[in-house]
């Protein structure tokens, strides 16, 4: 039977991120992606001014209630950027309802980067996001978010292996079955992720070449590709490997083409290869 994932993210019309990345990538994995939009924006907010924004917080409980009235069940809940503590609480309640059956919860605690919280968030939001992460089976933080979640010091790349593993062990206090830590770099020429599989205690790493520039939306692309692979029955380490390869190919394609990275990376032309990876 086809798996179904509730993808809870905003919609940015331009930028190839959030739901506009999650829906096609998860669908390419052969998994149904049901969208619960948290907001609608004309573009993403990274290095772009003048964007429009419409908050959909008030619609989220009604969407959840309608789905529940129809008897819709989910094999996974996958949440990304949430704009307020109220949205975090709504998602937390939705997870509780979804867990009446077998349901994998995947949380990307999007709230910080490069050593700092996003400007619209504060320590209270971080505490609420930490509570949401405690309901997750898989957490996908970057280095900054991991440091916040486990109360550790943030350190700029390049990283020492001991530091990365201290973050993973700090996050092992969370009930999650796995932690996928993104933005890991042991040298200036590569970047990737560290994967803690708590069922075995194994830590594995996946790296790709680091290309010049800032590429918006790649965190969403990575997490969506990982979600699709995991729902297809791949292990968490296999899912992270596939997601890393897929994300790098999108960055490389964009870098070679020389297109404006503010408007997202070309992941679409890699969807066929992603499907093939899932069949390897």
Locate the predicted segments by residue:
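Short, small-residue alpha-helix embedded
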Residues: 148, 213-236
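Phosphate-handling active-site elements
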Residues: 202-204, 229-243
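Charged C-terminal helix
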Residues: 237-280
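Buried hydrophobic packing segments
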Residues: 22, 146, 223-230, 243, ...
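Short pre-catalytic strand/loop immediately N-terminal to key active-site residues, enriched for Gly-Thr
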Residues: 13, 203-217
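Conserved N-terminal subdomain of the carbohydrate kinase-like
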Residues: 2-107, 111-119, 268-272, 276
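Conserved phosphate/ATP/ADP-binding segment of small-molecule kinases
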Residues: 119-203, 234
């Amino acid at each position: 039977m086809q798996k179904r994932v509730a993808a809870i993210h905003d919609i940015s019309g331009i930028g190839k991120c959030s739901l506009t990345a999650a829906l096609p990538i998860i669908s390419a994995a052969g998994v149904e992606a049901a969208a619960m939009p948290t907001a609608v924006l004309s573009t993403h907010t990274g290095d772009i001014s003048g964007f429009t924004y419409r908050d959909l917080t008030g619609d989220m409980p009604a969407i959840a209630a309608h789905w529940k009235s129809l008897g819709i069940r989910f094999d996974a809940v996958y949440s990304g950027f949430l704009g307020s503590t109220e949205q975090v609480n709504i998602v937390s309640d939705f997870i509780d309802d979804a867990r009446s059956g077998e349901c994998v919860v995947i949380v990307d605690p999007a709230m910080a980067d490069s050593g700092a919280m996003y400007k619209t968030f504060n320590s209270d939001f971080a505490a609420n996001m930490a509570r949401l992460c405690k309901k997750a089976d898989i957490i996908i933080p970057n280095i900054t978010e991991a440091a916040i979640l486990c109360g550790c010091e943030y350190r700029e790349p390049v990283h020492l292996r001991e530091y990365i593993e201290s973050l993973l062990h700090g996050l092992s206090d969370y009930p999650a079955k796995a932690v996928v830590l993104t933005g890991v770099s042991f040298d200036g020429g590569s970047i990737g992720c560290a994967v803690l599989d708590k069922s075995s205690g194994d830590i594995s790493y996946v790296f790709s070449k680091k290309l010049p520039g800032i590429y918006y939306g790649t965190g969403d692309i990575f997490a969506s590709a990982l979600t699709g692979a995991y729902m297809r029955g791949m292990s968490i380490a296999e899912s992270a490997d596939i997601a890393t390869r897929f994300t790098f190919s999108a960055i490389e394609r964009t870098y070679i083409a020389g297109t404006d990275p503010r408007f997202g990376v070309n992941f679409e032309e890699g969807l066929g290869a992603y499907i093939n990876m899932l069949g390897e």
